[in-house]
Each structure stands twice: as structure tokens, then as C-alpha cells.
Amino acid sequence: QRSLVGSEMCIRDRVFYSAYMPVSNHRLLPAPQSFRPPLLREHRLYQADWLLRFYHFRAEELLDEANPNFNPLVDPKCSWALNHPEFFPVEVNRADYEALLRVPGIGVTSARRILVARRCAPLTFAGLKKLGVVLKRAQYFLTCGGKYLEGLRVSPDGVLRHLVAQERPMLAQGAPEQLSLFEQTG
């Protein structure tokens, strides 16, 4: 959590994270071949840092006493959304910029495009897709004209299962391996 607080203090500065990689064969350290670095945690730290710098989240919103660690199954923004059902659904035709940024599947560019496009006409889910919104994540947290995406029949408990199923191909590829500076490759 210190890393998150540190990156929040210097909004414009870039923070770099690195999983521990033993490089010595000293007997008091884990053997390099037996130790798998927590690369997924490193990835989640970068995602959280991005939320702090560009999406106006605060560190205590991402990690708290009830959720002291990142969910390894979904990204920090999806995890926040699942832990705050009272915030959703967000009505895309009335929500302000800050509310749009908290919806999984809506990024900074898409949120700005939504604000511009809805001045001309009410937005639909088809229109959101054209604006670059990732509906496979956003559909669970948005309404257009007070209605959910047609055909969406998912209970709140089922949302996590659906989001995990979408990320499963990435997680099922096996644990990523850190490239070595010392070994020659092919």
C-alpha cells in the first residue's frame, strides 16, 4: 500500500515497480529456479498506479481493511466496481466525467467522447461501442436511457464470474516468466 500512497503524492511522476528476482545463489536466499516472481501483482500495481494518476482514484479506495490485497482475477477498476454496487448503474446520458471514469470499460478518451457525443443525441449501446467503450466490461455497470443492454440477464454475483471468464484466457496462459539479463536466448 505504501507504493500506492507514494505514487498518489506525486501525481505527474512515473513510478516503476519490479517483482523481486533473486540473482544470487547465496544459501540464505531462495534458489532462483525455485522462486516464481509475483508478476501478476506487479501488473496490478501498474494498473492501480494508472487509476491513481489518470482516473482520479485515491489509494484508500483501491485497497482498504476489507480488501487489503488486489484481486488476482480482475483488474483493480473492476474490483472497485464490484465492491461498490451502490455506485452503479451509471446512466451514460447524464453521468459526469468523474462517474464515467469509474465504469470498467470506459477510459479517459471514451469518457470525453461520451460527453461530446451526448450533446447531439442520446447515446445507445451501439453508439457507445462506436465511441470505443469496451462493452464486454461496461455493460454490467451502465444504462442507456434507463435500460440495461438488451438481453443482459446477470445477477450481481454473476458479474464477477462473467468478468473472470473474459480474463481467463490471459490468466490461463500460465505464469509469465521474467526475462533474464544473464541467460542467452535462442
Regions found by a protein language model. Give the residues of each.
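Anionic-ligand-binding alpha/beta catalytic cores of soluble enzymes and soluble regulatory domains
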Residues: 37, 41-47
